[in-house]
UniProtKB/Swiss-Prot annotation:
Pfam families: BMC. Homohexamer with a small central pore. One of its GO terms (biological process) is carbon fixation. The lineage of its organism: Bacteria, Pseudomonadati, Pseudomonadota, Gammaproteobacteria, Thiotrichales. It comes from Hydrogenovibrio crunogenus (strain DSM 25203 / XCL-2) (Thiomicrospira crunogena). Keywords: Bacterial microcompartment, Carbon dioxide fixation, Carboxysome. It is found in: Carboxysome. This is Carboxysome shell protein CsoS1B.
């Protein structure tokens, strides 16, 4: 996978898969972002990650968080990192063992 250093990262963590799917759908419809990952964290928590330009990621995460809240009590956290440091990138692409 090529490096995406300098491209914003948006994250939404949910309780359950349904709010995560709703958030992912809303994020990709709201702005020009790329859905890069879905992680099953454990205990029913799911994290969805998107990448794109900072403004687009900001709009996408807001839309995803709103959609997730409409599904019920699914939203745990929503966060944006405008320009992740290059040392963070390997953590995002680690393969599961």
């Amino acid at each position: 996978m090529s490096t995406e250093y300098g491209i914003a990262l948006g994250m939404i963590e949910t309780r359950g898969l349904v709010p995560a799917i709703e958030a992912a759908d809303a994020m990709t419809k709201a702005a020009e972002v790329r859905l890069v990952s879905r992680e099953f964290v454990g205990g029913g928590y799911v994290t969805v990650l998107v990448r794109g330009e900072t403004g687009a990621v900001n709009a996408a995460v807001r839309a995803g968080a709103d959609a997730c809240e409409r599904v019920g009590d699914g939203l745990v956290a929503a966060h944006i990192i405008a320009r992740p440091h290059k040392e963070v990138e390997p953590v995002l692409t680690m393969e599961k063992k």
